[in-house]
């Protein structure tokens, strides 16, 4: 128990990341200083003693190493710049006593500001502690923590500590299951004093519960092997099969294999031009062999082949076999006509560019591109053209001077809807006051 309690980060108390010995020597490539111990860097940044063999953990995670290096780098840079300006003031001929006086005043003001900040922080901490704890709880809590550290029976940080959870990515399905479903679905999330909703897994804040739920979903349902994210966990599990399982749907034209059947069907379309899925009598192509066989039967019942079929004996075996190959369409009980399957219906073709479309509606939309020049509305004041009469009238207001001016600022708009959106977005406080 004592060993597991010590194998945590000294600064963020994280035990899942990569831990580094706090007394290891590191060298910052940005600074000119030689290698120094992490404990020395941490002590200079936090102004807390770091000694080997104390009761606190002797490790620090990699992210905290980067953070403390950045802090030490900033402190070192500030000291270097201060020394540089001090040398410049000496070289400029300023009296030495004024230079030292300015430096002393600057240091004195800095010390006073630090003391005032520490005093205010202590007062805030004292007020928070008095609301939640009794006066004697602080001493007893320290004694309890020290006793637990010596015995190795510590399970987590005390309640008085303020933990800032770090952003983590759910790399496996087991880690994704650790996040409760109530946190993303039915649980009512409580906002803080500033009106923001804090993420329970990282330090981000959001203005609404919807944004927070979307963020949690993006954080948890993320693929650990690629940057894809999914709204539902079932879609993530189906996607993980692409990384973990072997493809089961193999193409019988080439050596490719796919995890899903619809992906295989999509791939088979590339073999339509030269594979067995293209009809030998026409240019029709199909995805499955069943569709191709039905299409071939359609060629056998056309009028071109009726002459050869009429010369045969209706009682012969060949005629029976040909009769079996004929497609048996289902008759419509309302008008007595045969209902042809949608895959065998001829696709609509554009008369101008000979393009094929999946539906008549798609063909009509395409025809608008050819007739665009006939339907454009031209402005009577300039050479601009517009698709609709509404856009043309809105444009002509600018020529006639019929504009909408904002009464709060000097902006002018062509459409009254634009003016309303502008007031709502920019002058919302003034509109409410009126």
UniProtKB/Swiss-Prot annotation:
A single BP term in Gene Ontology: regulation of DNA-templated transcription
Residues covered by the ZAD domain: 7-88
Record region (Disordered): 117-173, 295-328
SMART domains assigned: zf-AD, ZnF_C2H2
Zinc finger C2H2-type: from-to: 197-219, 221-243, 249-271, 277-299, 348-370, 377-399, 404-427
Tissue-by-tissue expression: Primarily expressed in ovaries and absent from testes. In ovaries very low levels in germline stem cells and cystoblasts but abundant in developing cysts and polyploid nurse cells.
An example molecular function term from Gene Ontology annotations: chromatin-protein adaptor activity
GO cellular component, one term: nucleus
Role: DNA-binding zinc finger protein that recruits chromo domain protein rhino/rhi to specific chromatin regions enriched in H3K9me2/3 histone methylation, mediating piRNA (piwi-interacting RNA) biogenesis. May bind to GC rich DNA sequences including a 5'-GRGGN-3' sequence motif. Nucleates rhi/rhino accumulation and stabilizes its expansion. Involved in piRNA transposon repression, particularly in the female ovary during oogenesis.
Record's miscellaneous remark: Kipferl is the Austrian name of a traditional breakfast yeasted bread roll common in central and eastern European countries. Its crescent shape is reminiscent of the redistribution pattern of rhino protein in the nuclei of kipf mutant nurse cells.
Entry protein name: Zinc finger protein kipf
Quaternary context: Homodimer; mediated by the ZAD domain. Interacts (via C2H2 type zinc finger 4) with rhi/rhino (via Chromo domain). Dimerization is required for association with DNA and interaction with rhi/rhino.
Modified residues (Phosphoserine): 316, 319
PROSITE patterns registered for this protein in UniProt: ZAD, ZINC_FINGER_C2H2_1, ZINC_FINGER_C2H2_2
Pfam families: zf-AD, zf-C2H2, zf-C2H2_4
Record flagged with keyword Nucleotide-binding: no
SUPFAM superfamilies: beta-beta-alpha zinc fingers (SSF57667), Glucocorticoid receptor-like (DNA-binding domain) (SSF57716)
Keyword rRNA-binding in annotation: no
């Amino acid at each position: 128990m004592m060993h597991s309690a010590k194998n945590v980060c000294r600064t963020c108390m994280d035990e899942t990341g990569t831990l580094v010995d706090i007394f290891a020597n590191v060298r910052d490539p940005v600074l000119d200083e030689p290698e120094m111990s992490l404990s020395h860097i941490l002590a200079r940044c936090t102004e807390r003693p770091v000694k080997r063999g104390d009761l606190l953990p002797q490790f620090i995670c990699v992210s905290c190493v980067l953070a403390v290096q950045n802090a030490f780098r900033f402190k070192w840079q500030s000291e270097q710049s201060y020394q540089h300006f001090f040398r410049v003031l000496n070289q400029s001929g300023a009296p030495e006593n004024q230079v030292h006086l300015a430096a002393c005043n600057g240091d004195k003001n800095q010390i006073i500001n630090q003391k005032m900040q520490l005093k205010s922080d202590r007062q805030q901490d004292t007020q928070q502690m008095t609301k939640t704890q009794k006066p004697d709880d602080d001493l007893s809590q320290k004694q309890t923590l020290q006793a637990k550290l010596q015995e190795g029976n510590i399970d987590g940080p005390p309640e008085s500590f303020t933990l800032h959870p770090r952003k983590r990515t759910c790399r496996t399905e087991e880690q994704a299951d650790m996040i409760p479903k109530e946190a993303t679905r039915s649980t009512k999330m409580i906002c803080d004093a500033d009106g923001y909703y804090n993420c329970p897994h990282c330090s981000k804040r959001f203005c609404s519960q919807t944004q927070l739920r979307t963020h949690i979903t993006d954080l948890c349902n993320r693929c650990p092997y690629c940057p894809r994210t999914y709204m539902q966990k079932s879609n993530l599990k189906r996607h993980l099969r692409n990384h973990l399982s072997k493809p089961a749907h193999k193409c019988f034209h080439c050596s490719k294999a796919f995890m899903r059947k619809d992906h295989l069907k999509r791939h088979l379309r590339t073999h339509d031009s030269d594979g067995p899925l293209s009809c030998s009598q026409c240019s029709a192509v199909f995805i499955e062999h069943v569709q191709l066989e039905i299409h071939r039967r359609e060629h056998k019942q056309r009028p071109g082949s009726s002459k050869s079929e009429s010369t045969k004996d209706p009682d012969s075996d060949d005629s029976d076999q040909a009769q079996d190959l004929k497609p048996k369409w289902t008759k419509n009980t309302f008008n007595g006509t045969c209902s042809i399957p949608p895959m065998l219906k001829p696709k609509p073709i554009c008369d101008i560019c000979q393009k094929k479309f999946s539906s008549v509606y798609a063909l009509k939309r395409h025809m608008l591109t050819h007739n665009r020049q006939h339907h454009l509305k031209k402005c009577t004041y300039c050479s601009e053209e517009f698709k609709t009469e509404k856009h043309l009238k809105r444009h002509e207001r600018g020529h006639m001077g019929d504009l909408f001016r904002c009464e709060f600022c000097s902006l002018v708009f062509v459409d009254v809807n634009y003016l309303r959106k502008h007031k709502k977005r920019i002058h919302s406080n003034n509109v409410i006051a009126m």
